[in-house]
């Protein structure tokens, strides 16, 4: 399996890396969040820009990013606009979604960009090309807040992401039972054994918490923890998350 190196973080080896979302609505709130995150043992910060009140002003988005970078100069930043159709805060046009992500990728000030799989393939490929040209890694994602698809479908989506050029394919699904969690873990194990790229998977809500902890066993390279406000159901406090991941890593 290929390793994906972003600043001082290597995906695809050791314990799953911890990513913590920033969900501030204003620059002041984002700076405050960044100052807090600076004191926490994490690997990646995800800026959930769909929470930012001036997201439709690209110049203000870049200025906000600059302010975050002042506080977190060496921390890998994952730039994510989560669309409303995949559980995000704001509905925007496809045109704006791609313009925003391409513009920020071109700045070279982000390390990773989230690209949702279920878009026009030509747009997705263009964004991947732009990101890679500016040394930005691509987390390609899909979120199902209603259900857990069949194992074959989860495998198919992750495999498709890799085929399109994702550096880190990612899927998050909602379990209705413990069996659904096992389906996600089984699919993760199957894909990670044959994939060229590290993958990121999770089963959401309380039922799925085990999937956020067991990535090193089943083959998920990153997990999401909460420092202030969870951006998805089931996220665990980052300090507790680190403790459990370290415990499992020592035994593995």
From Swiss-Prot:
The keyword tRNA-binding does not apply. Pathway: Metabolic intermediate biosynthesis; chorismate biosynthesis; chorismate from D-erythrose 4-phosphate and phosphoenolpyruvate: step 3/7. It is an enzyme of class 4 (lyase). It catalyses: 3-dehydroquinate = 3-dehydroshikimate + H2O. It comes from Listeria welshimeri serovar 6b (strain ATCC 35897 / DSM 20650 / CCUG 15529 / CIP 8149 / NCTC 11857 / SLCC 5334 / V8). 3-dehydroquinate binds at residues 46-48, 82, 212, 231, 235. Belongs to the type-I 3-dehydroquinase family. The keyword Transferase does not apply. NCBIfam families: aroD. PROSITE patterns: DEHYDROQUINASE_I. This is 3-dehydroquinate dehydratase. Keywords: Amino-acid biosynthesis, Aromatic amino acid biosynthesis, Lyase, Schiff base. Involved in the third step of the chorismate pathway, which leads to the biosynthesis of aromatic amino acids. Catalyzes the cis-dehydration of 3-dehydroquinate (DHQ) and introduces the first double bond of the aromatic ring to yield 3-dehydroshikimate. Homodimer. It holds the Pfam family DHquinase_I. The active site is at residues 143, 170. HAMAP family: AroD. It comes from the Bacteria.
């Amino acid at each position: 399996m290929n390793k994906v190196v972003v600043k001082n973080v290597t995906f695809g080896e050791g314990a799953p890396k911890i990513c913590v979302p920033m969900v501030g609505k204003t620059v002041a709130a984002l700076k405050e969040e960044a100052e807090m995150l600076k004191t926490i043992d994490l690997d990646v910060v995800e800026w959930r820009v769909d929470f930012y009140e001036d997201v439709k002003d690209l110049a203000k988005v870049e200025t906000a990013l600059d302010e975050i970078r002042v506080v977190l100069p060496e921390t890998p930043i994952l730039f994510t606009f989560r669309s409303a159709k995949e559980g995000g805060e704001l509905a925007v046009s496809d045109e704006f979604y791609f313009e925003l992500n391409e513009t920020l990728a071109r700045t070279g000030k982000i390390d990773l960009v989230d690209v949702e799989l279920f878009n026009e393939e030509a747009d997705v490929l263009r964004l991947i090309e732009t990101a890679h040209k500016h040394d930005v890694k691509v987390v390609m994602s899909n979120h199902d807040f209603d259900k857990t698809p069949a194992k074959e479908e989860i495998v198919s989506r992750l495999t498709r992401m890799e085929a399109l050029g994702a550096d880190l394919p990612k899927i998050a699904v909602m379990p209705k039972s413990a069996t659904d969690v096992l389906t996600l873990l089984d699919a993760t194990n199957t894909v990670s054994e044959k994939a060229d790229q590290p993958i990121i998977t999770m089963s959401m809500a309380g039922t799925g918490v085990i999937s956020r902890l067991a990535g090193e066993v089943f083959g998920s390279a990153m997990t999401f923890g909460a420092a202030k406000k969870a951006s998805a159901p089931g996220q665990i406090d980052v300090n507790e998350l680190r403790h459990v991941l370290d415990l499992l890593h020592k035994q593995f």
